[in-house]
């Protein structure tokens, strides 16, 4: 194994961050370490602790030009059974295959190290750069995400801060670093549906109303519905039922209600209000006595080809020689909150094959490549 002092600045920082057990929403002083580095490089620092969540906002530059923000999270998901890991998940070692192993290596302490080192180099090489380089970092991405990026964005918007471009360090790559970037995400709309019946004895169904029998045709119709056709950037909106619960546990009792939980992953072709109305129309069509609690996790967003996507794509080409693919697949990310400011958002990070898994790992050399891509993107946009 390579000695720590012989590693690149990016890998040294990545290892230092991984060795801090920052299971969400705990930051474990990861942000303190990043702020120390950025402060030494001349960034203005603004810690923002909101409830039990650590966040910070940092900027470099005094011009009125465009703002390029790096966004990310220091929190990680729990390790799962430590005995299932080949190493201590918070020890952070580079194995004989050149893989950096540890919780957060891919998601997303590797990216945090790459963007920090890239920004340090850029402001040293171009101290009078155009506009501003910014960082928006949270410890509440893997958890509820109420007091992290969402809350910071609300504060920034309230004081009329502008973010023109944002690179989120989520692990976007699939096989090779930079082979895929995310230029958008689907929206996520969840629902808890309660269908009310009348409880009774199974031998006397005429004295009861079975909510399972009543709800089944409506749920089947919802599952078969074509909500939209998608577009050039998004697949069609999907509807999935994740839970259905009813019954008292007894075999001779007709239950009094049924609860179904479902989720839409929706494209820009659909709206929250439109989906809610269509669901209500189908439920009413079946004559149900129903109630829904809706939960919107995020609206869909899309960054079409333009300054940011062009700069990221050409930087990947310059450094790796490969053409990148822009995709909107996958789950939600904090990019959904930043996009509400009218910001162009692109997610670019290392290979995501082992995120949230036991023995999470990333090719160590990829983080140095990622640093170069971030650095070149800074040059193209702000030098």
Swiss-Prot record:
This is Succinyl-diaminopimelate desuccinylase. It is an enzyme of class 3 (hydrolase). Its EC number is 3.5.1.18. Zn(2+) 1 binds at residues 73, 107, 170. Its cofactor is Zn(2+); Co(2+). The gene is dapE. Belongs to the peptidase M20A family. DapE subfamily. It comes from Pseudomonas fluorescens (strain Pf0-1). It holds the Pfam family M20_dimer.
